Amino acid sequence: MHDYIKERTIKIGKYIVETKKTVRVIAKEFGVSKSTVHKDLTERLPEINPDLANEVKEILDYHKSIRHLRGGEATKLKYKKDEILEGEPVQQS
């Protein structure tokens, strides 16, 4: 494994522990894909720093456990935003 990959993996691991941000947000901030962030955190980090990997795993598991709630909230906000922009209520079923 190249040194820059190890460094990035550790940086991302520490960053997610400090901020509790999602993989999607971190990927955007680090300029890499979600797949890369996920692979760094779930496959590479345990080899490099098992203790940090355990902390990260807890955060990822938490995010996974609430993703169905986040998705619903995002949809709700989207329709609310559309309603405000159009000036009339969006029909909901």
Curated annotation (Swiss-Prot):
**Name of one Pfam family that matches:** SpoIIID
| Presence of keyword Transcription | yes
Q: Which UniProt keywords apply?
A: DNA-binding, Repressor, Sporulation, Transcription, Transcription regulation
Report whether Plastid shows up as a keyword of the record. no
Would you say which domain of life the source belongs to? Bacteria
Q: Give residue ranges for domain HTH deoR-type.
A: 4-75
Query: Which terms under GO biological process does the entry name?
Result: sporulation resulting in formation of a cellular spore
Where DNA binds (residue ranges)? 21-40
Tell me the GO molecular function terms.
DNA binding; DNA-binding transcription factor activity
InterPro entries xrefs: Spore_III_D (IPR014208), Tscrpt_reg_HTH_DeoR_CS (IPR018356)
State its role.
This protein regulates the transcription of sigK, which encodes mother cell chamber RNA polymerase sigma-factor (sigma K).
Q: Which NCBIfam families match?
A: spore_III_D
Name the chain's protein: Stage III sporulation protein D
Annotated source species: Bacillus subtilis (strain 168)
Lineage, highest ranks first: Bacteria, Bacillati, Bacillota, Bacilli, Bacillales
This protein's gene is called spoIIID
